[in-house]
Amino acid sequence: MFKGSIVAIVTPFNKGVVDEKKLRELVEFQIAGGTDAIVPCGTTGESSTLDYEEHDRVIEIVVQQVNKRVPVIAGTGSNSTREAIEMTEHAKQLGADGALLVTPYYNKPTQEGLYRHYMAVAEAVALPQILYNVPGRTGVNLLPETVARLAEHKNIVAIKEATGSLQQASEVLALCGDKIDVLCGDDFITFPMMACGAKGVISVVANIMPKEVAALVDAFFAGKMEEARQWHLKLLKISNAMFIESNPVPVKTAVGLMGKASDEVRLPLAPMSDANKNKLISVMKEYKLI
C-alpha cells in the first residue's frame, strides 16, 4: 500500500512557532523531487514536542498542500493507548491516508502489551496503520512473532523496521509473508533491506536529497541492481552524517544550511555542536548541497 521513497519530513519552526509557509515549501520540494509519500509528525518532525493543536495543524497543512498527489502518513504514536487512538482518529478526520505509530516508549510494555496496544488502535480507527519499531529510542523491541500476530488485522498494513538489523527485518518478512509490508527505517541500509524484501524507506536523508533517495529506490524496483547499489554507496556518507547527533538535529541543521527553513529545534534538543556542524558542512560540500 505504502512504498517507495517516503520522507519523514521536518517541522520547521520560526521563533518557537511552526513555520507554516516553510512547511508548505518543503512539501513542494519533496513532491518535485519524486518522493512517494510524506510522513508529518514523525520522530524527524519532532512530534514529541508538538502540542496537540500543533500536531493536528501540521498534519492538516501537509494534507492540504499535498492535495492527494502522494499519500500522507501521519505520525500518531503515543505511550498511552487512549491517546494513540485519539490522535489516529484526528489524523483520519484531517484527511491523512495512513498513520505511523511508534511503539509505546518509557513504560516498557511486554510483547502482549504491545500486541493489545496496536490491536486496540486498529480496532478503533479504520485507517491503514504502520507499526514503528525503533528500540534504540523507545526501550522496547517489537519482536517478529508479535508483528506476525498483528499482521492478521486488516488495518495493520506495514512496519517501519528501525532496529538497524537485517536479521530482524528478514525474520519479519519470513514470518509474515505478504500479510504486511516492511519499510526500512534506517537510511544507511535501505538497499540491503529492499534486497531482503522491504518495499521502500521512511527516510531522513530525503529531507535534503529527495531526488537521490528516490533514484535509489526507483532503480531497485526497476531491476537496475547495479545502479541501486551505486546509489547506496554514494548516499552512505550523508546518511551517516544525519545521525552524528540526535535526529533531527543534523537534518534540521542541513535544511538551514541549504536555506530551506530555520535550523531551530525545540528543547530538550539543542543546536548542533560547532565541531559536529563543521563535520556536517564538510560532508554537505562534498555532495554540493551547499
UniProtKB/Swiss-Prot annotation:
Pfam assignment, any one: DHDPS
Protein origin, superkingdom: Bacteria
GO biological process, one term: lysine biosynthetic process via diaminopimelate
Keyword Cytoplasm: yes
Pathway(s) it belongs to: Amino-acid biosynthesis; L-lysine biosynthesis via DAP pathway; (S)-tetrahydrodipicolinate from L-aspartate: step 3/4
Keywords from the named record: Amino-acid biosynthesis, Cytoplasm, Diaminopimelate biosynthesis, Lyase, Lysine biosynthesis, Schiff base
Sequence similarity: Belongs to the DapA family.
Protein name per Swiss-Prot or TrEMBL: 4-hydroxy-tetrahydrodipicolinate synthase
Species in which this protein is naturally found: Geotalea daltonii (strain DSM 22248 / JCM 15807 / FRC-32) (Geobacter daltonii)
